[in-house]
Amino acid sequence: MFFGTYTPKLDDKGRLTLPAKFRDALAGGLMVTKSQDHSLAVHPRAEFEEMIAEISAKAKRGNPQARAYLRNLAASTDEQYPDAQGRITLSPEHRRYANLTKDCVVTGSIDFLEIWDAQAWQEYQELHEENFSAASDEALGDIL
């Protein structure tokens, strides 16, 4: 599971060092794809394959939204293996989509990671901070 917030730097070659505590979970390969809010999602390869299988099953049952999502997901996904220093190289398209420059934020999202531009993350946090309590009540109801 992935929890926490980290602030790695993107180097001039587009490489990002993954937080050390996540490297073992991602050593078998990972999939980087566009996510919501102009961020990137990083999934362990095995879990990504399971997710694709579920979406593919829905797409084969004639769900046009699932087919469109699967098509876009496949086109925007890049397979990566961390190097010996725990770095991955983000494609120019992914860097452009997420507006990544030098300062980045990596957040744990329970079963995957998100990569954000540091300024975009700060703005997102400020925008949603006062709604956090109401959103948790609505989304989680009696669980909490």
From Swiss-Prot:
* UniProt superkingdom: Bacteria
For this chain's UniProt record, which GO biological process terms are given? negative regulation of DNA-templated transcription initiation
Matching CDD domains, A to Z?
A: MraZ_C (cd16321), MraZ_N (cd16320)
**Does the keyword Cytoplasm feature in the UniProt annotation?**
yes
Q: Which UniProt keywords apply?
A: Cytoplasm, DNA-binding, Repeat, Transcription, Transcription regulation
Q: Which InterPro entries match?
A: MraZ (IPR003444), MraZ_C (IPR035644), MraZ_dom (IPR020603), MraZ_N (IPR035642), MraZ_sf (IPR038619), SpoVT-AbrB_dom (IPR007159), SpoVT-AbrB_sf (IPR037914)
- Coiled coil location: none
All copies of domain SpoVT-AbrB, residue ranges: 5-47, 77-120
Its GO CC terms are: cytoplasm; nucleoid
Determine if Transferase is one of this entry's keywords. no
- Pfam families documented for this protein: MraZ (PF02381)
The GO molecular function terms of this record are: DNA-binding transcription factor activity; transcription cis-regulatory region binding
PROSITE patterns given in the database record: SPOVT_ABRB
Localization per record = Cytoplasm, Nucleoid
**Quaternary structure annotation from Swiss-Prot or TrEMBL:** Forms oligomers.
Recorded family membership: Belongs to the MraZ family.
Q: Which HAMAP family match?
A: MraZ (MF_01008)
Per its record, how is this protein called by name? Transcriptional regulator MraZ
According to its UniProt entry, this protein's organism is Mycolicibacterium gilvum (strain PYR-GCK)
Q: What is the lineage of its organism?
A: Bacteria, Bacillati, Actinomycetota, Actinomycetes, Mycobacteriales
Q: Which gene encodes it?
A: mraZ
